[in-house]
Amino acid sequence: RTWISIEEPTAEDKKFLLEDLKIPAAFYNDIEDIDERPRIEVEDDWTFVLLRIPHKTTNEKSPFITVPLGIVYNKNYFVTITFYKADLLLDFVNYYSTRKTIEETDNLNLILRFHLSASVWFLKYLKQINIQIKNAENDLERSIKNEDLQTLFNIEKSLVYFNTSLRSNEILLYRFKSQRKIKNILEEELLEDVEIELKQAIDTSHIFSDILSGMMDAYASVISNNLNVIMKRLTSISIILMIPTLIASIYGMNVTNHL
């Protein structure tokens, strides 16, 4: 059996996958769709598993997103496809290149390990997100700036992506667990590891979301209070500025009546 790993597939890669390996075109198109949800499908002799994995971008507006990782396999090939350059996949390839070969591992074991790796990378990126939250919080304690608030808003979007994808991966894992029989104690232990890491990632993501939501509400209250203070000061200044005008008006009226 051969493992084929493809990132950012070219036109030649697509031709190889669809024409040479005969992978169903629908599977390939689903992997290309960034919004595709995790699931399991079978067509002809191919089994298709779609998993959501975390991805760190260079876009400040969406620093962390999630993207599809497609796993397509039959008795001869185990193919992984993603349209993004993913740290997870490089880490996974390095792991197997130093420890074991693909021939030594069955499909269920590999898929569970991809699940495990995805959860681990979610946790790694969540730690980076936590650091960004703390840095933005420290900056906001000194002075509330639009840039820092925008940073928190962008992080909040990333956490929404993480929460949604982690829940979808959890549903996929339970579905996979119910459809596939665990063969031995090692696979049972691996499945437990996957469930533990996935639950930890889900809980951590929710905690950070709640913390960030509370922070945003607090800063919104601070901004509102500051605005009220400014409006009161402006009102006071306006009243003070009106006093000379009022006196002049009264004096002018008295002069007119005297004449």
Residue spans for each PLM region:
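Peripheral, non-transmembrane regulatory/ligand-interaction domains of membrane transport proteins
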Residues: 1-180, 184, 190-193, 197-202
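Hydrophobic alpha-helical transmembrane segments and their immediately adjacent juxtamembrane loops
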Residues: 16, 22, 199-259
